[in-house]
């Protein structure tokens, strides 16, 4: 498995924000969200995407990844855990592109055997076969379903069958939407469409890869939540550490 980074921090987003957490970020994604417009220069070219570009553009960053097997991944988690009791956040990229990978499966099962609480951060577009892989029912899924502002085509980013499966089978699941203050009317329509087809808890977050851009959106997103009865989630890690990686 290609590991982009691993670190102990706090969960900065969604229903469980503020929780002590070990983050295990795996390489690879099925989306490239150009609409988020985060830019990084690499190998004499400009890469455009979300705030986890290093995990998405695997060809450009592969030399910085670690290749670890399931046992080595577990050892990393135990080392980061120290004597604490953190949750383990499996993130990316899109970690569920690996959900049928034998090495990945072994790692997740090892974590569960060692009594870790596992949270997946996913875009919700990949349907898990919960009958074939029932251990995923013991996990929590934070579903960052992409809206029009991501730049991804609708038929690719919305998989209602997958979203219903997370709600019906997982230990817990919820939506976390990244919203731009300039496109709230469209976002409202999209969110309602998703809720109609696949109801779940909602947490709305302001778009912004750094503290300055986050601040531009935050108040309007909070007011949008109050107006429409949604939960607001700030992005604590950006508030505290701006755009620093590995925190």
UniProtKB/Swiss-Prot annotation:
Binds 1 [4Fe-4S] cluster. The cluster is coordinated with 3 cysteines and an exchangeable S-adenosyl-L-methionine. Its cofactor is [4Fe-4S] cluster; S-adenosyl-L-methionine; Mg(2+). GO terms for biological process: queuosine biosynthetic process. The keyword Membrane does not apply. S-adenosyl-L-methionine binds at residues 93, 144-146. Residues 16-243 form the Radical SAM core domain. InterPro entries: 7-CO-7-deazaguanine_synth-like, Aldolase_TIM, rSAM. Substrate binds at residues 10-12, 25, 91. Mg(2+) binds at residue 52. GO terms for molecular function: 4 iron, 4 sulfur cluster binding; carbon-nitrogen lyase activity; magnesium ion binding; S-adenosyl-L-methionine binding. It holds the Pfam family Fer4_12. Its EC number is 4.3.99.3. Keywords: 4Fe-4S, Iron, Iron-sulfur, Lyase, Magnesium, Metal-binding, Queuosine biosynthesis, S-adenosyl-L-methionine. It comes from the Bacteria. It is an enzyme of class 4 (lyase). It catalyses: 6-carboxy-5,6,7,8-tetrahydropterin + H(+) = 7-carboxy-7-deazaguanine + NH4(+). The keyword NADP does not apply. Pathway: Purine metabolism; 7-cyano-7-deazaguanine biosynthesis. [4Fe-4S] cluster binds at residues 29, 33, 50. Belongs to the radical SAM superfamily. 7-carboxy-7-deazaguanine synthase family. Homodimer. HAMAP family: QueE. Catalyzes the complex heterocyclic radical-mediated conversion of 6-carboxy-5,6,7,8-tetrahydropterin (CPH4) to 7-carboxy-7-deazaguanine (CDG), a step common to the biosynthetic pathways of all 7-deazapurine-containing compounds. This is 7-carboxy-7-deazaguanine synthase. It comes from Campylobacter jejuni subsp. jejuni serotype O:2 (strain ATCC 700819 / NCTC 11168). The lineage of its organism: Bacteria, Pseudomonadati, Campylobacterota, Epsilonproteobacteria, Campylobacterales. The gene is queE.
